Structure formats: structure tokens, C-alpha cells
A protein has these predicted regions:
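Post-Walker A helix-loop "phosphate-sensing" segment adjacent to the P-loop in P-loop NTPases
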Residues: 170-172
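Rossmann-like adenosine-cofactor binding region
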Residues: 40-109
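Adenosine-phosphate binding glycine-rich loop
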Residues: 3, 88-148
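NAD(P)-binding Rossmann-fold cofactor-contacting core
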Residues: 24-42
Length: 172
């Protein structure tokens, strides 16, 4: 994030934490966007018109969270210089914003890892114990494998059941 221009979608508590980290990491410029303009934020329309050169976009808003998972806070097509997207939402695992980023070959990170990291630090604090940082990746990997599924589509008698039975044996 050093020397990058960052667009932050949302202006609540999570946005304030993101701003503090970006400032510590040497972010060149931070733009805060929300639905309605305030003294400290701009609107979606202003972001697209005046700040299309943002290199990193961070979604701290609930836009795109289940049950409104078909929403996204911004259209990445308006930001041709975007290099990375961070979406703090963890449900769904892949928000529409992250899906769009991946289709555009833009690096993207979702919110599940952050949620697990928060839980790790909460356990350490309340249990007065120290856990290895590697537990974060272990838990994220386990959760991802539990939440993902395989969908087989095809005409009748094309082998979906046979493939499903074979997959079930290998995956269980």
C-alpha cells in the first residue's frame, strides 16, 4: 500500500481501522466513499468520475453481504488502474466484488481470514494464552474446504452419478 491511492467503500468502524493501517503503511492518498456525501466522504458517482486512478479498493461496508450478496459497492470497470481489492465481507466467501476482481485479473482478498485472526487474538486475550499464528491459515483452510461444493451438470445418463460416487470416495 506504500505510495498507493486507496478508495475505501464505507465509513464506519471497520473503515476507521483500515484508515489507521493504511496511514501506518505509507498510503499516498485515502478516499472515503459512501452512499451519501458527508464532510469526510464522497459519493459513488464522485469516486467514479474523479478518482478512477485508485490503485487499491477496500470494501468496509456491508454492501454485498448475505442476504444482499448480489450487490457490490462499486463497479471495477470504472477503475482501470486498480491493482488489488480487499473485501472485509466473509459471507459469502466470494462477494460479487471479489468475483469481478478475479475476472479482471486483479488480486483480491476476502474477509474470512480477518475474521479468523480476530477470533485467534480474542482467544489469546480472554484465555491468557498464546496460539501459533499458523492456526489462522489452518482454520481458514478447514473452513474453506467445508464450505465449498462441487456441482455436476449434464444431460441424463451422461455419467454425473458415476462421477459423484467416485468423487465421494476420494474426498471422504
Amino acid at each position: 500500500v506504500k505510495d498507493k491511492k486507496v478508495l475505501i467503500c464505507g465509513d464506519g468502524g471497520a473503515a476507521q481501522a483500515v484508515k489507521a493501517v493504511l496511514q501506518d503503511e505509507g498510503c499516498r492518498e485515502m478516499i472515503s466513499m459512501r452512499r451519501t456525501k458527508t464532510a469526510d466522504t464522497i459519493t459513488y458517482e464522485e469516486a467514479c468520475a474523479k478518482h478512477h486512478d485508485c490503485q487499491i479498493i477496500v470494501n468496509t461496508s456491508p454492501c454485498g453481504m448475505y442476504p444482499n450478496h448480489l450487490d457490490r459497492p462499486i463497479d471495477l470497470a470504472a477503475f482501470p488502474d486498480c491493482e488489488a481489492v480487499v473485501d472485509l465481507i466473509y459471507n459469502p466467501l466470494q462477494t460479487r466484488l471479489c468475483v469481478q476482481a478475479k475476472k479482471r485479473n486483479i488480486r483480491c482478498a476476502g474477509g474470512l481470514e480477518m475474521l479468523v485472526a480476530q477470533a485467534k487474538y480474542a482467544v489469546e486475550f480472554f484465555q491468557q494464552t498464546k496460539l501459533a499464528d499458523t492456526i489462522i491459515d489452518t482454520i481458514v483452510t478447514q473452513l474453506m474446504s467445508e464450505k465449498r461444493n462441487i456441482v455436476l451438470i449434464g444431460m441424463p445418463s451422461c455419467g454425473k452419478t458415476t462421477i459423484a460416487q467416485s468423487l465421494a470416495k476420494r474426498l471422504n
